[in-house]
From Swiss-Prot:
Enzyme Commission identifier(s): 4.1.1.65
Main location: membrane
In-chain residues carrying the UniProt-annotated modification Pyruvic acid (Ser): 252
Superkingdom, taxonomy of origin: Bacteria
Keyword field: Cell membrane, Decarboxylase, Lipid biosynthesis, Lipid metabolism, Lyase, Membrane, Phospholipid biosynthesis, Phospholipid metabolism, Pyruvate, Zymogen
Co-factor note (free text): Binds 1 pyruvoyl group covalently per subunit.
Annotated site residue numbers, Cleavage (non-hydrolytic): 251-252
Family listed: Belongs to the phosphatidylserine decarboxylase family. PSD-B subfamily. Prokaryotic type I sub-subfamily.
Modifications the protein undergoes after translation, according to the UniProt entry: Is synthesized initially as an inactive proenzyme. Formation of the active enzyme involves a self-maturation process in which the active site pyruvoyl group is generated from an internal serine residue via an autocatalytic post-translational modification. Two non-identical subunits are generated from the proenzyme in this reaction, and the pyruvate is formed at the N-terminus of the alpha chain, which is derived from the carboxyl end of the proenzyme.
Pfam families: PS_Dcarbxylase
Protein known as: Phosphatidylserine decarboxylase proenzyme
GO terms under biological process: phosphatidylethanolamine biosynthetic process
Length: 288
């Protein structure tokens, strides 16, 4: 059965399906939208008591529901100055060292940081000998992404690609999954060196949004697009630890890359299969 599910993913018109779902998710369809939201809540056992707006009828579009805000007191940001915070609600897929430029995906599968970052050798070299963490956001999860550490945006890259599902089954069976799916790469300058936040698209992920640019919608085709940002002056984009940096309009995965000697150790419970909650301790910074 698993092999059939994987084979179907290769065969399905994933981009067409994602565009179709995206149009509905953005539509104000009244009672139809509310009915779909209620079904989704029941199907995925979503705890709406955590939402700032718990009533399904309050959301005009499915996207508004899916990217709903939570009550801030439910996700306090860890205050230790030498500790990064979890950026999302989700589950750890993998984490560990970047070895010879390779990132572990699942048993028998890895991919390179260069491929993940859109083929840019210079960007990839900044993370040689560093660490990575991959976190999967299930449909039931809160889908806003937050900063694990204070950082100033220096570059954003859009990388076109496939739209395979990014669930654990697919990660175990599709080679180089996160380096072949459509994705947005944001590189920040932090007190412990560069941080890459890679927002990976997936089947039915209608779009990826960042705080500074809105929905990332480059022209179609296979070209990689990059934007450089000033790191000083009034136009610099600096986000504090715990600040929102982006959203998935339908769920996916975030891959984070850290420079060599940025992380001393991951926090307790940060290991494959473990649940994450935004704001909780994520990794201890190495003394600089």
């Amino acid at each position: 059965m698993d092999s059939i599910k994987i084979a179907l993913q290769y065969m399905l018109p994933k981009h067409f399906l994602s565009r179709l779902v995206g149009k509905f998710a953005a539509a104000e369809a009244g009672a139809i939208t509310t009915a779909v939201i209620k079904w989704f809540i029941k199907q995925y056992k979503i705890d709406m008591s955590e939402a700032q707006q718990p009533e399904p009828e309050a959301y005009k579009t499915f996207n508004a529901f899916f990217t709903r805000a939570l009550k801030p007191e439910l996700r306090p940001i860890c205050q230790e100055s030498n500790m990064m915070a979890h950026p999302v609600d989700g589950a750890v897929s993998q984490c560990g060292p970047i070895e010879a430029g390779n990132i572990f995906q699942a048993k028998g599968h890895s991919y390179t940081s260069e491929a993940l970052l859109g083929g840019n050798k210079t960007d990839a070299a900044r993370f040689d000998g560093g660490d990575f963490a991959t976190i999967y956001l299930a449909p039931k999860d809160y889908h806003r992404l937050h900063m694990p550490i204070t950082g100033t945006l220096s570059k954003m890259t859009y990388v076109p690609g496939d739209l395979f599902s990014v669930n654990p089954l697919t990660a175990q069976n599709v080679p180089g999954l996160f380096a072949r799916n459509e994705r947005v790469v944001a590189i920040f300058e932090t007190e412990v060196g560069p941080l890459a936040m890679v927002l990976v698209g997936a089947t039915i992920v209608a779009s990826i949004e960042t705080i500074w640019s809105g929905t990332v919608t480059p022209p179609g085709g296979k070209q990689v697009f990059s934007w450089d940002y000033p790191t000083t002056g009034p136009e610099a984009v600096t986000l504090e630890k715990g600040a929102e940096m982006g959203r998935f309009k339908l769920g996916s995965t975030v891959v984070m890359l850290f420079a060599q000697d940025a992380i001393e150790t991951f926090a307790d419970g940060v290991e494959p299969g473990e649940t994450t909650r935004m704001g909780q301790p994520f990794a201890r910074l190495k003394q600089q």
